[in-house]
From Swiss-Prot:
Keyword Oxidoreductase on entry: no
Protein name: Probable glycine cleavage system H protein 1
HAMAP family xref list: GcvH (MF_00272)
Residue span(s) of domain Lipoyl-binding: 31-113
Role this protein plays: The glycine cleavage system catalyzes the degradation of glycine. The H protein shuttles the methylamine group of glycine from the P protein to the T protein.
Keywords: Lipoyl
Amino acid sequence: MNEMKVGRYVVLTDRLYTETDEWVVLSNDNVAVIGITDYAQKKLRDIVGIELPQLQKEVKAGESVGVIESVKAAADIFSPLSGIIVEVNNKLLEHPEIINKDPYGEGWIFKLKASKLSEEKEKLLSPEKYIEKIKGG
């Protein structure tokens, strides 16, 4: 896994990103694995709870599908793509702190079968563009 650092934040180069600090890893069968970025988890600090997306729910790109709760704040989880939620990371219900420890790996949040991938993929940010966003914000 190649990574780039922006100050104390890590951005991996093997995935795409959103303006709302989610990451997306796409597979050949249009299934996307989605989580929140290192930048997002460090801003939230100690994550204490999560409301996971509803399995088999059809969602639109940009729709709020869940909530992450930290000692400091609550933040919506947005779906970066339209499609159907096919899997959620139930481990996070008992151990939401995994997101703090490993946001890009064990801390993945949900998987989605994308329905409009070709048109929506263009709206996602490359690692370089996401770094520009972090530097600007």
